[in-house]
Amino acid sequence: MNILKKMRGLLSLFSLTKGRTVGDLLLLFPLTIMAQDDVISCLEVYNLKTNTHTVVREFDYKIEAPNWSPDGKWFVYNSGGRLFKLPTENPSAEPIEIDTGSAKGCNNDHVISSDGKWIGLSDKWPSKVFVVPFEGGEPREVTPDGPSYLHGISPDGSEVAYCAFRGDKRAVCTKRLDDSPERCLTDADGLNDGPEYSPDGRHIWFNSSRTGEMHVWRMNVDGTEQTQMTFHDSLYSWFPHVSPNGKWVVYICYSKGDLKADEHLPNKNVELRLMTSKGKKDRQLVELFGGQGTINVNSWAPDSKAFAFVSYRLKR
């Protein structure tokens, strides 16, 4: 029986990986790949008023994807399959592990609810979405199917948005926290990833390679009026994050010559850019070494005046 189970598992694994790009495999197996990196991680804060960024803490190991808690008191990040919180007023303090119960393979897709009471996360293979109390506890499964990679929680906390691998589709889907079925909002070819709700709950922002190039898109929360928002000739645009006041969107870009459209790899020269929520006044904020793990999820401060991200240095 065990041999048969293992054979079925290998066949399932083969069916998921066959024909996939490196970008797909990073989505499918983020912990396995990222654990091989030998880097120093720099947790940084970008200040929109001064247009400067400051390293608030260095780590001699890999950390990824900071969140900024709605009360402004905590940074939350993942490392080694666990979630940790760090006081924003004293980031040199000892990191506090968040008890995620049986979820011991947390990847870089985790989001804090707008009331700060719970955390949504994606956990280990085949990466399903779970929710846990912010103060810790046993996870509750939200998506029975995987792979599912969480990126957004609705402002009222009633549903989540995620990238779902379903057959040959890589779609943006949403699901309420009850037993309701999931709704897939995109049917376009390519990778549709990074869905995040606007603070007013009217829109979902995401990135898509449906045109053959990766750009930021926006749609109504019901999936209608899917609209391209970035048009860079030399950049692939990923992971749009809307500020709490709804005015700004920060996102990360790769140079087109460095990778394929649907790959978001680590250890690349990337840039963070800012535009208005109407797609105007687009500008570069900072160039850095990073990529995967830098700003996968929303990291805005609650006052919309700053956001957090991670840059990296290779160990020599």
PLM features per residue range, with description:
Residues P70-D71, S114-D115, P155-D156, P199-D200, ...:
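Residue-level detector of Asp-centered blade-edge/turn motifs that repeat once per structural unit
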Residues G291-R316:
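Blade-level signature of beta-propeller repeat domains, shared across WD40, Kelch, NHL, RCC1
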Residues N67, V111, G152-S154, E196, ...:
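Conserved beta-strand position repeated across blades of beta-propeller domains
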Residues L43-K62, L86-C106, V132-P147, K175-L191, ...:
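Multi-bladed beta-propeller domains
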Residues Q36-D37, V56-R57, P70, F75-G81, ...:
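Beta-strand C-termini and the immediately following turn/loop, strongest in propeller blades
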Residues K104-D109, S113, K117, S122-P155:
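Asp-box/WD-like beta-propeller blade repeats and closely related beta-sheet repeat scaffolds
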Residues I40, P126-K128, K169-A171, E213-H215, ...:
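A detector of repeated loop/turn-to-beta-strand junctions in beta-rich toroidal repeat architectures
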